Amino acid sequence: MSSIFKEGIYDTGSYARTGTLDLNGIQIQTPIFMPVGTRGSIKSLTSEDIDELGYNLILANTYHLYLKPGKEVFDHFQGLKNFMSYKKALLTDSGGFQVFSLASLFKFEDDGVRFQSHIDGSHHKFTPASVIDMQRSIGSDIMMVLDDCAPYGSDTKRLELALDRTHRWAKESFAYWMENPGGQNVFPIVQGGVNETLRLRSLETLQKIDFPGIAIGGLSVGEPRPEYIRILECMAPHLDKSRPRYLMGVGTVVDILEGVKNGIDMFDCVLPTRNARNGQVFTSKGKINLRNESHRLSDSPIDPQCECKVCKTYSLGYIRHLHKVKELTAFSLSTYHNLFFMQSFMEKMRKSIEIGNFQGFYDHWKNLFGS
């Protein structure tokens, strides 16, 4: 039984459920969406903004924080939370995915992965123990193990090799973490691409280890949505009910709907913040491109039904103008709105599960945001 998670209410027609995460006394209601503060900041927002928006759990990236500002800085400041004046809970990924996708060169070894920084070409090595040590210095409440995320389209041989590494490194990470767990938790990462047999093998292997939660990686990395849904559906009946389930890097409205329907509790993605900076915002009527000429004279808010301070204060026409002339305020206003939308969306989703109307909620939002 996970000591950090308490189940709530189950939807009778799917695997959707509510629950409560307890991370060192900070209560987080699930299903939850986590904004991404890759380098220790939610781009264009302050830590006060994040608190005002009601987010009790955010994500940061070990790879980027390891390179800049580095472990020494976090040891000096006693963690990222103190460094960025953030008071709530923090999750960090292990940095493995960024090594494979960003590093100019990388090479697998039995005990880890060597890579060159995408910033200056300097040489580094991640091992299961070193990424735990880095995340201890960051001070995250939930840490991730080092894993091997095979690219979408990999053949069975490559996927099996990734599973072997991922499982071996997960066991090493667990043993190392257990020497000094402190107040931090660590999740393993299920891999296997879009191969159902390998996904179930990975899930079974990792759930046999007494990790406090489980993460699912390697989805929403380029596969068609039917493949994404198929893998979620194959795993859903086998997910341990006592542990929180985290689907990594997933954050579109439709993908979250499919995830929750199949028992996922936690999501993160850069999409709401990145889209906001590019002039795309989410509303109760679907997506809006703020730069469209049709909004030039609009004195309406982004979303008349939205209660955020941006929609209560500024017109769509004004925010469009800020984007068109590339004012930095455009980024902060649009990002604030999108994260308010995501927080409200997840709150309404939890309510729909509690009152037995998840299917109606699912149908409504899927119709608005795409098939």
Swiss-Prot record:
**Listed pathway(s):** tRNA modification; tRNA-queuosine biosynthesis
Role according to the record: Catalyzes the base-exchange of a guanine (G) residue with the queuine precursor 7-aminomethyl-7-deazaguanine (PreQ1) at position 34 (anticodon wobble position) in tRNAs with GU(N) anticodons (tRNA-Asp, -Asn, -His and -Tyr). Catalysis occurs through a double-displacement mechanism. The nucleophile active site attacks the C1' of nucleotide 34 to detach the guanine base from the RNA, forming a covalent enzyme-RNA intermediate. The proton acceptor active site deprotonates the incoming PreQ1, allowing a nucleophilic attack on the C1' of the ribose to form the product.
Q: Tell me how this protein assembles.
A: Homodimer. Within each dimer, one monomer is responsible for RNA recognition and catalysis, while the other monomer binds to the replacement base PreQ1.
Known EC number:
2.4.2.29
Family in the record = Belongs to the queuine tRNA-ribosyltransferase family.
Enzyme class (EC, first level)? transferase
State if Glycosyltransferase is listed as a keyword.
yes
Question: What is the reaction catalyzed?
Answer: 7-aminomethyl-7-carbaguanine + guanosine(34) in tRNA = 7-aminomethyl-7-carbaguanosine(34) in tRNA + guanine
Please give the residue ranges the record annotates as the region RNA binding: 249-255, 273-277
Q: Name one GO cellular component term.
A: cytosol
Key words of the record: Glycosyltransferase, Metal-binding, Queuosine biosynthesis, Transferase, tRNA processing, Zinc
* Residues reported to bind substrate: D93, S94, G95, G96, F97, D147, Q191, G218
In terms of InterPro entries, this protein maps to: TGT, TGT-like_sf, tRNA_ribo_trans-like
Gene Ontology molecular-function annotations: metal ion binding; tRNA-guanosine(34) queuine transglycosylase activity
Q: Which GO terms describe its biological process?
A: queuosine biosynthetic process; tRNA-guanine transglycosylation
On cofactor binding, the record's note says:
Binds 1 zinc ion per subunit.
Answer whether the UniProt record assigns the keyword Glycosyltransferase to this protein. yes
Needed cofactors, names only, are: Zn(2+)
Put simply, this protein is called Queuine tRNA-ribosyltransferase
Name the catalytic site residues.
D93, D268
Binding locations of Zn(2+)? C306, C308, C311, H337
